[in-house]
UniProtKB/Swiss-Prot annotation:
One of its GO terms (molecular function) is metallopeptidase activity. Its EC number is 3.4.11.-. A divalent metal cation 1 binds at H67, D180, D235. A divalent metal cation 2 binds at D180, E213, H329. The lineage of its organism: Bacteria, Pseudomonadati, Pseudomonadota, Gammaproteobacteria, Enterobacterales. This is Putative aminopeptidase SgcX. Keywords: Aminopeptidase, Hydrolase, Metal-binding, Metalloprotease, Protease. It comes from Salmonella typhi. The gene is sgcX.
Length: 372
């Protein structure tokens, strides 16, 4: 079977799943994993885990993960007029909300809607140039009143996702909602396909995780069951090749996988990852040996599950691979199929390494300690 990066990515992008509502994506991931993996399970929180490679109890355990959920909204109140008030789930870009088309997961099926905006003809002053506060926004589904909205299947708690089906742009770029992080999910499936018939010296656990966009900790139950020796996350990172960001960093689309040196959220002390130098060397050496382009990144304002994984159990060495993405958390994110394919190649090369090539121990550079 030939793995198609574009077809797989587009099929995942057409699915909807805000944090806590990832089941449609999880079903696809689980079914795909079950075709070749030695063991597959879904935990009570919704994480999907697949095991490949060595069955030995003392085998080095590499965990590779990406999150299934996307940013979106949830209905907070149905107005008597039938318009819907809502809250953000995760961090969708508020500046892009007015005028956006959305999909609501109604009780009887999906319902289309749009986020209303004051008629430009009647807008005055800042109303014409500044995005309204969240409590000034509403969703219009065409309901004539509250009872009509309820008959259409809407209730408090109805999940809402941005609507923008995937499109191809020039130079192997794609535009869609939810590239964060269906790119990573696609990478997991690409690695799964590559490992299906390959004997490995290590145990590889591929994890499609939940609730990253909401609390960044949905993957924690998996760690405590798998107990990995090393974890590598796959996520997007802001591409800085647009006119507004080109002076900020050199990370750009179509120039390879990003290797995170540093990321953090908030003011730097809340959570983040400083990748151990020995892991940076391992990633860059492996990429060089396999002619895979990579680019280093320092990304303040970005955080992934690695910020919390690293302090679990006895400490878990972590690294992050990033796929550069323009217009993050908007309805129209843009990323490169080439970069995604390179990410799959690098992860596959890592999975095929021998245990001795993984620098687990910080003092000696040794591999994992013998398991009790």
């Amino acid at each position: 079977m030939t793995f198609s990066v574009q077809e797989t990515l587009f099929s995942l992008l057409r699915l909807n799943g805000i944090s806590g509502h990832e089941s449609s994506i999880a079903n696809v991931m689980q079914h795909a994993f079950e075709q070749q993996a030695k063991d597959v399970w879904r935990d009570r929180l919704g994480n999907v885990v697949a095991r490949y490679g060595s069955d030995k109890s003392d085998a080095l355990r590499l965990m590779i993960f990406a999150h299934m959920d996307e940013v979106g909204f949830m209905v907070r109140k149905i107005e008597p007029s039938g318009f819907l008030r809502f809250e953000r789930v995760g961090g969708p870009a508020q500046i892009t909300m007015p005028g956006s088309i959305v999909t609501l997961a109604g009780c009887s099926g999906d319902i289309m809607g749009c986020i209303g905006i004051k008629a430009y003809h009647f807008a005055k002053g800042d109303e014409r140039t500044q995005p309204p506060a969240l409590d000034k926004l509403w969703i219009d589904i065409g309901a004539k009143d509250k009872a009509d909205a309820e008959r259409m299947g809407i209730q408090v708690g109805t999940p809402v996702t941005l609507y923008n089906p995937p499109h191809c742009l020039g130079n192997d770029l794609v535009c869609s909602k939810a590239l964060d992080d269906r790119l990573g999910c696609t990478a997991l499936l690409g690695v799964a396909e590559a490992l299906a018939s390959t004997p490995l010296d290590i145990a590889v656990f591929l994890v499609a995780s939940v609730q990253e966009e909401f609390n960044i900790r949905g993957i924690v139950p998996v760690l405590r069951r798998v107990r990995p020796d090393l974890a590598i996350g796959i996520d997007i990172t802001p591409s800085c090749d647009t006119p507004d960001l080109q002076d900020y960093s050199d990370v750009r689309v179509n120039h390879g996988v990003g290797i995170t040196c540093l990321n953090y959220h908030g003011r730097g002390t809340l959570a983040g990852l400083i990748t151990p130098p020995r892991l940076l060397r391992m990633l860059e050496t492996t990429a060089h040996e396999n002619n895979i382009p990579v680019q280093r990144e320092v990304a303040p304002g970005v955080i992934t599950e690695t910020g919390y994984i690293q302090v679990e159990l006895d400490g878990i060495p972590c690294a992050s691979l990033s796929i550069p993405c323009r217009y993050t958390h908007s309805p129209a994110e843009v990323a490169s199929l080439r970069d995604l394919a390179d990410c799959i190649r690098l992860l596959t090369a890592l999975a095929n390494m021998s245990p001795e090539q993984f620098p687990i121990d910080p003092e000696t550079g040794a591999t994992q300690e013998a398991r009790p």
